[in-house]
Curated annotation (Swiss-Prot):
Belongs to the NAGSA dehydrogenase family. Type 1 subfamily. It is an enzyme of class 1 (oxidoreductase). It comes from the Bacteria. SUPFAM superfamilies: Glyceraldehyde-3-phosphate dehydrogenase-like, C-terminal domain (SSF55347), NAD(P)-binding Rossmann-fold domains (SSF51735). GO terms for biological process: L-arginine biosynthetic process. The active site is at C149. Coiled coil: none annotated. This is N-acetyl-gamma-glutamyl-phosphate reductase. It is found in: Cytoplasm. GO terms for molecular function: N-acetyl-gamma-glutamyl-phosphate reductase activity; NAD binding; NADP+ binding. GO terms for cellular component: cytoplasm. Its main location: cytoplasm. Pathway: Amino-acid biosynthesis; L-arginine biosynthesis; N(2)-acetyl-L-ornithine from L-glutamate: step 3/4. The gene is argC.
Length: 345
């Protein structure tokens, strides 16, 4: 059994990692840390796990984590991950980092959008952990930067078109909606029930921190720099992301041709489901799963293509994708511990 540590496990992503790994046939959770909950039993913080795990939260002590584990998931805030990840790598541990600290390869871009980077020497080594695009690199990696939730839904939605140079990359407009769990578990006024329920708003317009990550990945797919107009919105639901991407086609294509392109591109991907022509995704149909559902439509009147992509932001957008990456890094079946179907309704 692989001994696994989850560093920073008191948030929604952390509890989802615990839940998934408790059901993983090749993993034993040996260390779970939390600064604010150190010393508390895990099931006292997360009653949903009662009777399934007999551990307490450890403080974030690097030496203890190294001693107790073979593989480390870091689910810490941005800037906090880079303070501990180098030590884990130096000790010979493989790491999947769920923060943004190693997603951007250009240190200047990271520092423009986040803060000073204290281990920039690892940025070139870190593999961007979107298996459907970078599977072999993940297999060979010791440090995987788990993608953000919005970028995951967007990159999977646009990859077939950008890989085949079928759209004008300069025309890209991306409109995304996320459930409130994307804002995390910490208390804040904007996440209160009365602030969110029955409301719907845009936020981070032209300034969301996922923008450079989106542009980096889309640029790699296109083989040239890409800039996008990206507007996220807050949905009054617990979980789920729906991204609608718009782009101008460089040559006429009808919906049937586009659907065939997507079906062929993702034919071998167990976690990407392409909808038949005439059907579009719903976040309700991926909730609680590692699936990404995609639908595509040609707007002949405007010469544009419209792609709709949905994921569970806490799973394919975070925890289950991290487990998928671990499976690849360990040369295990990619869907090990991830075979649950979505919850419905």
């Amino acid at each position: 059994m692989l001994k696994v540590a989850i560093v920073g496990a008191s948030g929604y992503t952390g509890v989802e990692l615990i839940r998934l790994l408790l059901n993983h046939p090749q993993v034993e959770i040996t260390c779970v840390t939390s600064r604010q909950n150190a010393g508390a039993s895990i099931d006292s913080v997360f009653p949903s796990l009662a009777g399934r795990i007999d551990l307490t939260f450890d403080p974030v002590d690097v030496d203890t984590i190294i001693r107790k584990s073979d593989f480390v998931f870091t689910a810490l805030p941005h800037k906090a991950a880079m303070a501990v990840v180098p030590a884990f790598l130096h000790a010979g541990k493989k790491v999947v980092d769920l923060s943004a600290d190693y997603r951007l390869h250009d240190v200047d871009v990271y520092e423009a959008w986040y803060d000073k980077h204290t281990s920039p020497e690892l940025l070139d080594e870190a593999v961007y952990g979107l298996p459907e695009l970078y599977r072999q690199q993940v297999v060979d990696a010791r440090l995987v930067a788990n993608p953000g939730c919005y970028p995951t839904s967007i990159a999977l939605g646009l990859a077939p078109l950008l890989e085949n140079n079928l759209i004008d990359a300069a025309s890209l407009i991306i409109d995304s909606k996320s459930g409130t769990s994307g804002a995390g578990r910490s208390a804040k006024v904007g996440s209160l029930y009365c602030e969110v329920n029955e409301g719907f708003k845009a936020y981070g317009v032209a300034s969301h921190r996922h923008t450079p990550e989106i542009e980096q990945t889309l640029g790699q797919l296109a083989g040239k720099p890409v800039q996008v107009s990206f507007t996220p919105h807050l949905l009054p639901v617990n979980r789920g992301i729906l991204s609608t991407c718009y782009a101008s086609l460089v040559q006429p294509m009808d919906t049937a041709q586009l659907q065939q392109l997507y079906a062929q591109r993702y034919a071998g991907e167990i976690f990407v489901r392409v909808h038949p022509q005439g059907e579009l995704p719903n976040i309700l149909h991926v909730r609680g799963s590692n699936y990404c559902n995609i639908g595509v439509v040609s707007d002949k009147r405007t010469g544009r293509v419209i792609i709709v992509s949905v994921i569970d932001n806490l799973l394919k957008g975070a925890a289950s994708q991290a487990v998928q990456n671990m499976n690849l890094m360990q040369a295990w079946s990619e869907d090990s511990g991830l075979s649950d179907l979505p919850l419905y309704p």
